[in-house]
Amino acid sequence: RRKELPPACLSSELRSPQMRDIQKLIPAEAIVYGRLPLMITENCLVQNETGCHLSEAGDAVPQQAPCRKPNDLQDRTGAKFPLLPAYGHRTEIQNSAPVWLADKPEWKHCGLTYARLRFTTEAPAECADIFRAYQTGAPASGPFTRGLYYRGVD
């Protein structure tokens, strides 16, 4: 008897034809909106800056920790990279611009089981606006990236 597998979230480094090939084997989803993680640091960057001491809290990040507040890194061009708390009191550095594919119909023809909208730093009203934009295929209203969906990785 064959069991159903839950959908796997595909790598954002895959191009559309590669996604189409994988979905033939397993149910698949892809992130079609959101800030993608660039790296996870071994240490909490906010702790290094503010000196928050959470050793008594263990590996989980408490709700009131300074790293739960909006923090970012800024590069020399002024781009801001949001910092999200990660398990083990690490930091997940997000891309400065979200992936935006609402106005690109190609992802709808890859055979994906689901399309994931990855909300990380957005306010609730902004999440609703983005959801509606994806329903209508609207272009982005701010800075965005297409990720690697069209370029891929060598």
Q: Model-found features: residue ranges?
A:
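Active-site pocket-lining/capping segments in soluble small-molecule metabolic enzymes
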Residues: 1-154
